[in-house]
């Protein structure tokens, strides 16, 4: 593999792992099978709980046995989760699907960036700049998928899920064919400390990095609210009188807005807009619960712009702060662990977001 092929395969493996084809219609799909709002909340809890339980063990395991193995397992579990949605379309089938998806999410969170970072170092590719490029390409690709998701759903509710399974399978195939981690890195992993010692070392790195703590505090807390609102946008649309036929196109615009957020992050001459996002973001929630179409659409624009901007900012900062590849997966899993706690806390203490 050369530098060009390394960039291309990392890009394709990431892009085809998208869930954008079924995300816009997921709530409609569950409502189609007589799921209530409280049922959807419970499924979200199952997903979060599974991610919480497996987050740290999966990161530690990735550092021990190899990130590629764990990334392959993650993609396989994601496919199994989607198959559960299609083959067992009732409450307990959905519970199983979210349980598996939560485990898959935990396996991926630490392994994916660590594995790609190791490959990029091996082939002299700057991963942080590549990741920003991938994010922009992914948003454009996801725009197309979201635009046709409701069309596929109207033909058959299962089509968006089967389409995602095909894309995930392509991503899995690409990852399987990618090189193994460097021998020196794997050798160092074999000599790494035990779980308790690793936890102390990694926590020490996080606690002593004040800039990281502030970014995590703001980004994770705020985006936790945005993520939860994303689950209930469909309910907001219904109360605002927005028809199901245009929900898909509305969701598809999220990708364009997210791409704009990345553009704002990249450009230093947008300082006023960056500060404005910070100021107006809290008011977006008031706009949402007004159920007035113009205000709802403006609120979504603000939230999606903020979501992509601050997530990209935190992602790149975390990647650049990794100074030891032998514990990089566990380091990222620890940060994801804090993220899960933040999301769960928001979910439990801010019931007003269950619009």
Predicted segments with their positions:
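Conserved small/polar residues in nucleotide/adenosyl-binding loops
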Residues: 346-352
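Juxtamembrane intracellular "pre-TM" segments in multi-pass secondary transporters
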Residues: 1-2, 181-214
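Helix-loop boundary and gating motifs at the non-cytosolic
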Residues: 2-52, 211-250
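Symmetry-related core transmembrane helices of the 12-TM Major Facilitator Superfamily/SLC fold
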Residues: 160-176
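Hydrophobic core of transmembrane alpha-helices in multi-pass small-molecule transporters
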Residues: 93-108, 297-310
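Cytoplasmic helix-loop-helix junction between adjacent transmembrane helices
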Residues: 101-138
